[in-house]
């Protein structure tokens, strides 16, 4: 009887495993991939409840445009050693973020939290 339960449980585990997508886990992008994705493009997402757009210029300038706030101009770069995106704002200095490829697009990861976003080709901010 115990053997039959074990075999049933093993069969169920195999069945579930066979139908779990292989790409279900988010993967962190590398430095060269990030530079190519971001340069001359705009990220659109929601950060802590506020919609935003952020443009990444080829000269290392980034423009952060929150839906209900003041536009900020800062700097951006990719850290080749860590493979992370870094942004600089006068009020806080350099801050690093892992960038993940997800099932629905991309996400920033900072301090254990993820913030989904999509990338739009070109510049889609006012300034």
Which functions belong to the PLM regions below?
Residues 1-4, 22:
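Intrinsically disordered, low-complexity cationic segments
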Residues 3-7, 12:
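N-terminal export leaders
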Residues 9, 19-77, 81-127:
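Lipid interaction determinants
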Residues 13-17:
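Alpha-helical transmembrane segments
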């Amino acid at each position: 009887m115990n053997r039959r339960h074990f075999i049933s449980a093993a069969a169920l585990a195999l069945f579930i495993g066979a139908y779990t997508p292989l790409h279900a886990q988010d993967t962190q992008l590398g430095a060269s991939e990030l530079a190519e994705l971001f340069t001359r493009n705009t990220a659109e997402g929601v950060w802590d409840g506020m919609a935003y757009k952020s443009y990444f210029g080829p000269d290392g300038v980034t423009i952060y445009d929150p839906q209900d706030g003041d536009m900020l101009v800062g700097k951006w770069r990719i850290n080749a050693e860590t493979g992370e995106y870094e942004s600089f704002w006068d009020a806080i200095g350099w801050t690093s973020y892992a960038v993940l490829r997800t099932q629905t697009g991309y996400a920033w990861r900072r301090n254990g939290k993820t913030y989904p976003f999509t990338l739009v080709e070109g510049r889609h901010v006012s300034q």
